[in-house]
Regions:
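Conserved catalytic core of nucleotide polymerization and phosphodiester-bond processing enzymes
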Residues: 1-218
Length: 218
């Protein structure tokens, strides 16, 4: 709110706020459907039939859990949250969290499939390509069998932890990097196209673009 308050519309204009509708869930569905993962086609069909489809509500209905819990789990998995943090966000104990996740993955299997696939690719190739072809690199390494050690460049990690005792770091964030990177591609591309038409955004906030809009009282 403080940063937004710095910006005001141009003279004789009003403030216009435009954002994507569930940009990141749609990207998850897009990538899962490209792989023909089980369950993704249901969401594709729903988006094609009704562009106001609420991803979180669909997951809520499928997994038979409240929408708030569905949204928390969705975003937690998209952003690479660990089980401990997800438990805290849900406000439940470990057993309940594990039951919720098990039910979620059984009824919405494509999210976990996509998460595991992106982790594997990041580990094998060292990068993922976003929807516009930018590379999200995973070029740091950590011990393969120890948690909490500092991630280092390859040569440093080999010296510190042993040449054959390391793995790529941060791969659990692979889905997050793919989805947020692709969302950034879409938003920046939209900003570029709009600027070519003479519409310059005053500020970008995540998936939102804010403009001065002619105050047409008619």
């Amino acid at each position: 709110p403080l940063i937004r308050s710095i910006f005001i519309p141009e003279k004789d204009c009003k403030w216009g706020i435009f954002d994507y509708s569930q940009q990141e869930p749609r990207l998850v569905v897009h990538y899962a459907s490209l792989k023909n993962y089980m369950g993704a086609s249901k969401f594709v069909d729903s988006y094609q039939e009704d562009d106001t489809t609420d991803f979180h509500q669909m997951v809520s209905d499928l997994a038979d859990i409240p929408r708030k819990q569905a949204k928390t789990i969705n975003l937690g998995l998209f952003y690479g949250m660990g089980k401990g943090k997800l438990m805290s966000q849900l406000g439940v104990d470990q057993e309940t969290a594990e039951d919720l996740l098990a039910g979620y993955h059984e009824r919405v299997p494509f999210v976990k499939k996509l998460m595991m696939d992106t982790m594997r690719k990041a580990g094998d190739k060292g990068f993922l390509s976003t929807i516009e072809g930018r590379r999200c690199r995973f070029d740091q390494w950590e011990p393969a069998n120890e948690w909490g050690k500092k991630a280092l460049p390859l040569a440093d990690a080999q010296r510190e932890y042993g040449e054959h005792m390391i793995k790529r770091a941060w791969t659990y964030k692979a889905l997050n990097r793919l989805i947020q990177g692709s969302a950034a591609d879409q938003t920046k591309k939209a900003m570029l196209e709009l600027s070519k038409q003479g519409y310059l955004a005053h500020i970008q906030v995540h998936d939102e673009l804010d403009f001065s809009v002619a105050n047409d009282k008619d």
